[in-house]
Amino acid sequence: QTALSLVGALQAAEGVTTELITDLNSVNFGDATTAAFPTESLKNGQNTSEYIPLNKIAQYGLYFNGYNPGRFDGVYDSSMSSKVKAFQEFYGLTGIDLVTSGEVNVSTMKSLSTSKGDVNRSAKACDCATVLNKQQALDLKNAGFSHVGRYLTGSVGTEHIPKFITLDEIKCIESAGLSVFPIYQDGGYELDYFKNPTQGSIDAQTAILAAERIGVPAGTTIYFAVDFDCYGYQVDTFIIPYFAHINMFFNSFRNKKKYKAGIYGPRYVCSKVSDYGLVS
């Protein structure tokens, strides 16, 4: 709700909405919000009356993401520019002709205010539940991808179509010039899955056995999914204990290949679990 309120404030500042927003779940950083964002980026010294409200929203966006700008008055100064630059670098926005370092364009604002960021940005990695054949792997390579995430176990859909990676598929992926990273997800779509923290130990064991079976190299990171948006207290109460059990299992003698545990989920959840030192 806090993040959505930021998008709502942006829409009000842009003039996209002039009415009181009574349901934040209806707020979306869509085409209208994107089109109304200034063509000229927010930047150091850009402090006219038109930009002050937008600068202020960017300042709160920085704060929400852990980059305290030190002020919330809408004045874009060199300190704020430094925080924007650090945010852009950490979230992989630089070096792909998407942003100007230290300036807030619409892509940076999307990343500040939404978990998914700019969905139109280029990417080097993807994931899929489809068992890839040779042509599909080549298509991904030709589309500019270099890494593909694939699932170690499970099925998808009401017809339970297998989604787990196979040895033949690995050959197809590698022959196309792609690298593959393993994902474990046999649940995790809703909070109830995480309410018993020992589920983490069960999932850790299942993932390690599956990785060993198909020859995943020692030391590889296996990504465990949290596939829904959590409130902060839910992360503390349920997600952290779940990953604590994963971490404990991965650090035990049963992890003979010394695989590492990673996390795959919303930005805040990933950051919080990482801050606890439970994932690599």
Residue ranges and their predicted role:
Residues 130-132, 147, 153-158, 186-191, ...:
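Solvent-exposed loop/turn segments at secondary-structure junctions
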Residues 19-23, 70-73, 96-100, 151, ...:
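Surface-exposed patches in mature extracellular/periplasmic domains of secreted proteins
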Residues 137, 170, 204-208, 240-247:
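Generic structural signal for well-ordered alpha-helices
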Residues 1-147, 151-153:
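Cell-envelope/ECM-targeting effectors and their regulatory/trafficking segments
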Residues 157-230:
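Substrate-binding cleft of extracellular glycoside hydrolase catalytic domains
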Residues 141, 174-177, 251:
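Anion (oxyanion) recognition and catalysis
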Residues 61, 123-127, 146-151, 179-184, ...:
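Structural recognition of the beta-strand scaffold that forms the well-ordered cores
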Residues 210-216, 229-280:
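Surface-exposed substrate-engagement region within the catalytic domains
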